[in-house]
Amino acid sequence: KNHARKVVTMELQTKMVPVRSREGHPVLTGPQAMPGPSATYIAYGKSWANVSNTPFRHYKSKNHEGGISTPLIAHWPKSITAKNELRSQPGHLIDIMATCVELSGASYPKTYKGNKIQAMEGQSLTKSFAKNVNVDRLLMWEHLHNRAIRLGKWKLVAVSRGEWELYDMEKDRTELNDLSKEHPAKYEELKALWEKHAHRTK
């Protein structure tokens, strides 16, 4: 019942899009879901938590698709001419700031009160509003020792301190066929990139 209530609430909130600003102009709205159901395995067990994210594996806190894949709805009639269309290229929460900065015409600050501000690592999503954009970008995740790195169609992912698994996301987004042994060079390449990123951000 708890999960059903959340689904109904989400549907009702989605119907509130579009939202207009106080001046009466259309604005960009993006209801992005939290990654995976909230504390689901605590409420009704790990098996049902997996069911909630079917066909993807795992759930919130993990970096398989069941834990990180979330919908984003963009609605801005004045600037987005595409209607009721889907986009399949990967994005990340870090892209939201870059998107808002570009759409608003603002400039991202380099300093604040004399302190240097780290440059944005996200990329604006505005190009994807018009069409699907295929970008071989590097994305990484880590949460509670759950790790993942994605480059183009390849994704390397591990649960906790377990072994890495390699997946071709174009053919196997459900992450069922580990290709680590079939593509050892790609496995080692992504693993090395992950270690470099982990060292930079520790």
Features from the language model and the residues they span:
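Histidine-centered active-site microenvironments of extracellular/periplasmic hydrolases
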Residues: 1-75
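Active-site-proximal N-terminal segment of extracellular/periplasmic enzymes that hydrolyze or transfer
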Residues: 2-7, 177-185
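C-terminal cap/loop subdomain of S1 sulfatases and analogous C-terminal strand-loop tails that border
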Residues: 37-68, 79-89, 93-171, 186, ...
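A non-catalytic, amphipathic alpha-helix used as a structural packing/dimerization or gating element
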Residues: 182-196
